[in-house]
Regions:
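Short, intrinsically disordered, charge-balanced linker/junction segments flanking boundaries
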Residues: 164-167
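Pocket-edge structural micro-motifs
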Residues: 40, 151-153
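Short helix-loop capping/hinge motifs at secondary-structure junctions, enriched
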Residues: 154-161
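Short, low-complexity disordered leader/linker segments with a strong preference
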Residues: 1-35
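A structural signal for short loop-to-beta-strand junctions that line the ligand-binding cleft
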Residues: 27, 88-90, 108-149
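Early extracytoplasmic/lumenal segment of secretory-pathway proteins
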Residues: 23-101
Length: 167
């Protein structure tokens, strides 16, 4: 994801996820409110602490005048718990947490028409079941990658061919 796309996505998401009380998606973007509180996985939304190339916040703050506050969470359960307590505008939840947040009414639908380039997304990503519920879109894809099944060859001399060995 380019830095510009990351900044744009952050802006749109921040504006689209203003409060849980709003039942319908926004119809237009207004001036930023001045503060954006985010729950994120460590390393997902950075100020360049670990690598100067990954400072996604400073330019966003400069362009919008909106202060970004990031609270990192180590697990999906922690993200869901923090969102339940309130006070956050955006969460970088994984699929398992996304559905809990949606069903728990902790997030609101977003208006994808306000997101530049939404129509160009691969439908496999844009229509993800982990953020599309009841005909409404509750999130945007941030990253996409494999979930690997690794195993100990001493325990499984024949490679597992299904996740059923885990669940």
């Amino acid at each position: 994801m380019s830095k510009k796309l990351a900044r744009c996505s952050l802006y749109v998401l921040g504006m689209a996820c203003l409060t849980v009380q709003a039942a319908e998606p926004l119809t237009s973007l207004d001036k930023p409110e001045g503060r954006l509180d985010i729950i994120a996985w460590p390393g997902y939304i950075e100020r360049g602490q670990t690598d100067k190339q990954y400072d996604w916040i400073s330019q966003f703050e400069k362009e919008t005048g909106c202060q970004v506050n990031v609270k990192t969470a180590a697990t999906s359960d922690e993200m869901v718990s923090l969102m339940a307590k309130g006070g956050y505008d955006l969460v970088t939840a994984s699929g398992d947490a996304s559905l809990r947040l949606i069903m728990g009414k902790r997030v609101q639908p977003i208006n994808t028409a306000l997101i530049a380039g939404w129509r160009t997304l691969d439908p496999r990503i844009a229509q993800g079941a982990w953020f599309n519920v009841g005909g409404k879109v509750y999130g945007t894809p941030y990253q996409w990658g494999p979930n690997l099944l690794m195993y100990n060859t001493r325990v499984f001399p024949t490679p597992p061919d299904s996740w059923s060995v885990v669940f």
